Amino acid sequence: MTAKHRGAQAEASAPAGALPADAAASRVAWLREELDRHNYQYYVLDAPTVPDAEYDALFSELMALELEHPELQTPDSPTQRVGGEPLSAFDSVRHRVPMLSLNNAFADEDVLNFDRRCAQGLGRTAPAAGEADLFSAADAVEYACELKFDGLAMSLRYEDGRLVQAATRGDGETGEDVTVNVRTIKAIPLKLRGQAPAVLEVRGEVFMFRRDFDKLNARQAEAGEKTFVNPRNAAAGSLRQLDPRITARRPLSFFAYGLGELQGVERPPTHSAMLDGFAALGLPVCKDRAVVKGAQGLLDFYRDIGKRRDDLPYDIDGVVYKVNALAEQERLGFVSRAPRFALAHKFPAQEMTTVVEDIEVQVGRTGAITPVARLRPVFVGGVTVTNATLHNEDEIRRKDVHVGDTVIVRRAGDVIPEVVAVVAERRPADARAFVMPTACPVCGSHIEKLEDEAIARCTGGLICAAQRKQSLLHFAQRRAMDIEGLGDRLVEQLVDQGIVRTPADLYKLGVAKLAALERMADKSAANLVAAIDKSRATTMNRFIFALGIRHVGEATAKDLARHFGKLDALMAADEAALLEVNDVGPVVAQSIAHFFAEPHNVEVIEQLRAAGVHWPESEPVAKSPAPLSGKTFVLTGTLPTLSREDAKELLEAAGAKVAGSVSKKTDYVVAGAEAGSKLDKAEALGVPVLDEAGMLALLAQAGAAPAEE
């Protein structure tokens, strides 16, 4: 700890009121500097150095001192973010430098044409139409590439380093003055760091991180208030509140990406240097950006971000390309209220509107009855969508979805399409409300809904063909028994024709019977029989997972296998014994005990054993902390000898948690070849990075042996 920090700590021990005026002024100045520094490390560097409780203590002390000494309070103090009295309306603001929109590109050809126009405008020899990167290295145009955030465009005006005005984009010429609201956003500095220009107008985006959006909606729902459709709507609605105290409670963030008016300093030579300058002044700047040359560089950036889009912590709807040299931007100029030097390359829309033509119910593996909206076909998220999940009856009531409604449908990545909201003003007069059936549409069994559950279930069990089909598909999946070639259509035929009723029946199948089925030939039938035969040798944890016990996923199956060692011991365990297993609580214990108490399930297990399904067994392991218990790992890149799944199994077997993204709570990142942004973030946060050898050495040091396969 430095002398400065030691002195500050000593002063902190004295009550605020006990400090004389000079000491209070000194302490207030130090507290503001510390809070600004912590905000910079958190919002700009994404590398917080103190826990939230310590930050809150510093903030509370500053607030107490300012109350005790009101003459020390200043507009740029961190305490002034809480929001003042409500406004009657927002004033209009005329932008000194217009906030122009960008032209859009939706296809590669649009990008090639953009690059060609830029090259020609700068007097360079352009390639022929439809060809990319035929320039020499010297002739290729250099571009700055960044993300196109799905939020609300904002202009921040700083004078002598202090925030004096914030305005929305509006029509590009005139926006709304939202300064009082923007001052509540912790990511936006009220005072810039270092030597700030006399006037600096920063353009950027106010948005909401997905994690913060989810928490906000959870709070809204808990309070019985309206939830938001998406983070963009939440950000826009929060920023345009007439009561800034409401805005202060909303988790808004900000990224800077452009420059308006500038006085007192020379403009930087390039757009990328400008962004680096913003970060040095304490403004948050997105790290997912690059400088590339030529059209191929632009397309490579677009594809790289497209692959990672669903893993980003915020919503984007495309990427933006800008000629990097500011002097070249000026040469290219503007056309039709848009810059010639910039282009927005859009991703396929993740939200679209369409019409609900019907609402049907599907029956899942555990009997769950899921309402599904049958939609008028719509292209969203890169595919044509005709169905969307409605989750459960309560969700339909909450969203007020009727047959005939126009709805907003969202599809992101591999996520199942869902209806996120109804466009109420477009509801037709003949719209029909959904009524949950009382009997299963597949087997006719009674549908029941327990008081403490949101999901209704068919009570038919394996009598229900729909549940049998889903159970067989689960049993055969790669992470369970790994029976390659057993897909939906084949399972449909096997169940509908009465050939297979339980998983054990799969091991009785022969080539002749399979080859007689639709779309099956001798070769594909032989391949499937071979895959079924191969699956006889498995592991205990895979077998447990394959059984489809409710609430038992892969991780719990591994814990059960390690704890009991033998399947018979697990089957004989009562709820009290099951509660001795790591991470098994009362609900899971009850579900497991109930499953093995069902005679039909025991009979199927014995049939599977009789069919030759086997696995190595071991002695029970007493409940004790695993060597890496409590540690969080993130895997990125390609490891030299282990697949990512193998590495994950080794770490989980040692008690570690394997997460999908890097945060300040991550203990280690294991990086292989072609590691991407996760490695960059780990290095920025100071998270230890291991290669495969380092991970194996850590496992060996912890006494964790590789899991048997």
From Swiss-Prot:
Gene3D superfamilies xref list? 5' to 3' exonuclease, C-terminal subdomain (1.10.150.20), 6.20.10.30, BRCT domain (3.40.50.10190), DNA ligase/mRNA capping enzyme (3.30.470.30), Helix hairpin bin (1.10.287.610), Nucleic acid-binding proteins (2.40.50.140)
Q: Which GO terms describe its molecular function?
A: DNA binding; DNA ligase (NAD+) activity; metal ion binding
Its GO CC terms? Answer: cytosol
Q: What InterPro entries would the database entry show?
A: BRCT_dom, BRCT_dom_sf, DisA/LigA_HHH, DNA_ligase, DNA_ligase_AS, DNA_ligase_CS, DNAligase_adenylation, DNAligase_N
Mind telling me which Pfam families this protein's record contains? BRCT, DNA_ligase_aden, DNA_ligase_OB, DNA_ligase_ZBD, HHH_2, HHH_5, Nlig-Ia
> Which residues of this UniProt protein bind NAD(+)?
D52, A53, E54, Y55, D56, S101, L102, E146, R169, E205, K322, K346
Q: Which reaction does it catalyse?
A: NAD(+) + (deoxyribonucleotide)n-3'-hydroxyl + 5'-phospho-(deoxyribonucleotide)m = (deoxyribonucleotide)n+m + AMP + beta-nicotinamide D-nucleotide
The UniProt annotation places Zn(2+) binding at C440, C443, C458, C464
* Alphabetized UniProt keyword annotations: DNA damage, DNA repair, DNA replication, Ligase, Magnesium, Manganese, Metal-binding, NAD, Zinc
Domain BRCT residues, every copy: 623-709
One of the GO biological process terms: DNA repair
Which sites are catalytic?
K148 (n6-amp-lysine intermediate)
EC number(s) stated in the UniProt entry for this protein: 6.5.1.2
Query: What are the required cofactors?
Result: Mg(2+); Mn(2+)
Which PANTHER family does the protein's record reference?
CHROMOSOME TRANSMISSION FIDELITY FACTOR 18 (PTHR23389), DNA LIGASE (PTHR23389:SF9)
Q: Which family does it belong to?
A: Belongs to the NAD-dependent DNA ligase family. LigA subfamily.
**So what does this one do?**
DNA ligase that catalyzes the formation of phosphodiester linkages between 5'-phosphoryl and 3'-hydroxyl groups in double-stranded DNA using NAD as a coenzyme and as the energy source for the reaction. It is essential for DNA replication and repair of damaged DNA.
Q: What is this protein called?
A: DNA ligase
